[in-house]
Amino acid sequence: MDNVDFATLSIFDIDKEGKQRTDTMPSPDNHREQTKIALFHGGVDKHFYDNGFQVEDDRVTNDTFDGYDMVLLGDIHKRQFLNKEETIAYPGSLIQQNYSEEPSHGFLLWDVEKRKATYHQVENDYGYKIIFVENGLIRNKMKFVPPKGNIKIKYTNTTLEQLKNIQIDLRKKYPKLKDIVTERQDNISIGDDRENKLDISYITDV
């Protein structure tokens, strides 16, 4: 790539207290090329996790990368931009990693000259889906169910028989599902607790 210089702030550059150093970040003035891109794998400034929780890093901030045209970040799995110009960004993980992450994942494709990124989704048949069941009925929308993925059923006020029937229906509709697990959300007794803890993967072939 012509006329582009990359600079990296290493997560291994830490002080005696184990905190991230920023004085090792190369100055953009040391680069002669027209476009200067900074790279870092770690938490920067105010950023969000997939659970919606926001954290703030007071060691590495947006100002750490002043003078760079774009900052490409890693580590945080949630896709987000950290400045209004949208030149400092986490692309997020390439595919969904667990139940806490949203199903939409992919990568950012950068137009270096325009300093703009476009999001491209990567289709994934092996994702994760949480299904909420109340009174024996599925309550959330079923717009996206990974056909070869993992399902977690969170249920309340639902009998064991109702729960098994829901799993049977899911297996019929999505026969290639990898796993279905259940998680009770209330204290209502729905039968023998020992039975509730059984792995009911035997319905895989139904």
Name each model feature, range by range:
Residues M1-I88:
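His/Asp/Glu-rich metal-coordinating catalytic cores
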Residues V112-V206:
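Accessory, non-catalytic peripheral segments of nucleic-acid enzymes
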Residues D2, H31, N83, P103, ...:
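A generic structural signal for short, non-catalytic loop/turn and secondary-structure boundary residues
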Residues N3-I11, H105-G106, G191-I203:
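Short, surface-exposed amphipathic charged segments that create phosphate/polyanion-binding patches used
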Residues T35, S104-H105, K148-N150:
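Short, surface-exposed beta-edge/turn micro-motifs
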Residues D15, T22-D29, A38, K84, ...:
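A structural signal for the main folded, soluble domain(s) of proteins
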Residues M70, G74-Y126, F132-E134:
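A conserved active-site cap/scaffold subdomain adjacent to cofactor or substrate pockets
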